[in-house]
């Protein structure tokens, strides 16, 4: 209830400012407002790249970004306090919210480290990661589950020296050499420049997948449309398989457990 009151108050104050500007003869070009929910499993560097195209629309845009858990964001989405939610997993069909998953794209994982670790573990990757110091996302995240499954399939058990809720904090510790760390492949160039790290290896089959979730079957808000179009055509253009492009949008509640990439039964969105 408090968030609803806050949003209405914000709109009232904006209208008040517009009224004052009109009375004083100032231009009143009120920007289009979009409220975006960002699931806390989405790296902030990815979220920024997803949202940025919405700021390049012909008309002015004012964005409000709210980070939170799946439960919080879906509750707000269901009563239209949010225009769209950005998530790293689709909404599960068991969730009693009439919403739709719009696939933005997917990317493999890059394994990075400081030069000392690169020299030690690049040769023979990925089996070289046996007993290597590793920084990991928390075990309840989609990317951690996918990473654990991949390592187990290779019979590789690194030595976990740190677990983090926040991917940016994980990368900060990786930058000081605490351990090998992974990141979405689409961020590799950015992280190499930012942290002066290097690639140890990469795992294109360990996918991080990103979705826009809305109460609409077809996105209508111009900012949400811009986010989806740019993600598919630019950010994830080389990482989105043809099969995913043919089935980008799915109603969440009616999907069966075995249905395609639009939903992951192993990692339902509320648990990610």
Go through the PLM ranges and name each one.
Residues 1-28:
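Alpha-helical "hinge/linker" immediately C-terminal to small N-terminal DNA-binding modules
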Residues 1-8, 46, 50, 146-147, ...:
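Short amphipathic alpha-helical coupling segments at ligand-binding clamshell hinges
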Residues 27-28, 98-139:
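Flexible hinge/capping segments at coil-to-helix
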Residues 31-93, 270:
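Central regulatory/effector-binding core of bacterial HTH transcription factors
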Residues 33-37, 85, 135, 181, ...:
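Short, well-ordered beta-strand segments
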Residues 69-73, 78-81, 88, 142-198, ...:
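Hydrophobic hinge/microswitch elements
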Residues 88, 119-123, 131-154, 220-229, ...:
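Secondary-structure junction motif
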Residues 94-107, 121, 168-217:
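Beta-alpha-beta core module
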């Amino acid at each position: 209830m408090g968030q609803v009151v806050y949003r209405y108050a914000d709109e009232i104050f904006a209208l008040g400012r517009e009224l004052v500007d009109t009375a004083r003869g100032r231009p009143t070009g009120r920007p289009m407002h979009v409220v975006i929910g960002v699931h806390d499993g989405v790296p902030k560097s990815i979220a920024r790249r997803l949202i940025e195209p919405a700021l390049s629309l012909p008309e002015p845009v004012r964005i409000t970004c709210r980070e939170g858990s799946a439960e919080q964001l879906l509750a707000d989405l269901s009563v239209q306090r949010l225009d769209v939610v950005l998530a790293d997993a689709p909404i599960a069909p068991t969730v009693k919210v009439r919403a739709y998953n719009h696939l933005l794209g997917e990317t493999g994982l890059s394994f990075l480290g400081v030069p000392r670790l690169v020299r030690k573990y690049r040769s023979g990757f990925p089996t070289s990661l046996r007993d290597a110091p590793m920084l990991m996302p928390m075990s309840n995240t989609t990317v951690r589950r996918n990473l654990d499954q991949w390592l187990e399939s290779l019979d590789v058990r690194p030595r976990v020296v740190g677990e983090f809720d926040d991917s940016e904090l994980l990368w900060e510790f990786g930058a000081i050499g605490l351990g090998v760390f992974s990141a979405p492949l689409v961020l590799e160039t950015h992280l190499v420049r930012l942290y002066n790290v290097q690639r140890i290896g990469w795992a294109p089959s360990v996918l991080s997948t990103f979705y826009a979730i809305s109460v609409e079957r077809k996105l209508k808000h111009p900012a949400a449309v811009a986010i989806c179009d740019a993600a598919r055509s630019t950010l994830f253009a080389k990482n989105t398989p043809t099969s995913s492009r043919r089935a980008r949008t799915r109603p969440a509640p009616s999907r069966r457990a075995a249905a395609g990439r639009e939903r992951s039964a192993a990692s339902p969105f509320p648990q990610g």
